[in-house]
């Protein structure tokens, strides 16, 4: 959502699917997470997925492994990134997380994962029926986050 918002600010383009995603409350997802016994959760906002995941892992004393191919993106996010619509906050997020990160993905993928969000959904530790599984939490390792 962040790169699409940056593109909107620069071009005036409207992205209805991004607006819909931002205005859809996380209530149903939160209810499902609680019902499924989620261990912890956070909403993905200004720190992006990587920043919020790093904070979650650090506070919980664990490390996280992300499967980059399993992470869903809104249509147009990669095109907005390719067009250079990246906020300074996204770059600062990545700079902040990078020392705690082991990644085998390219810089563009890292920027999307660090994308500063207005409303990026919930990151939940637990098994939620119907929710995408993007990784797992493991005992604390050398790095807080590993991306493959």
State where each predicted segment sits:
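Glycine-/charge-enriched secondary-structure boundary and capping motifs
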Residues: 35-148
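Short, acidic (Asp/Glu-rich) active-site segment that either coordinates a divalent metal cofactor
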Residues: 1-34
């Amino acid at each position: 959502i962040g790169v699409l918002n940056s593109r909107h600010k620069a071009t005036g383009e409207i992205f209805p699917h991004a607006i819909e995603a931002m205005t859809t409350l996380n209530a149903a997802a939160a209810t499902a997470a609680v019902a499924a016994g989620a261990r912890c959760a956070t909403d993905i906002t200004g720190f992006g997925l990587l920043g919020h995941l790093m904070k979650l892992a650090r506070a919980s004393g664990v490390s996280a492994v992300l499967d980059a191919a399993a992470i869903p993106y809104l249509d147009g996010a990669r095109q907005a990134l390719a067009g250079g619509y990246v906020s300074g906050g996204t770059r600062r997020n990545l700079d902040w997380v990078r020392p705690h990160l082991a990644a085998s993905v390219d810089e563009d993928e890292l920027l999307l994962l660090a994308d500063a969000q207005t409303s990026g959904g919930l990151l939940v530790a637990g098994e939620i029926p119907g929710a995408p599984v993007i990784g797992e939490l493991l005992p604390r390792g050398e790095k807080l986050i590993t991306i493959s």
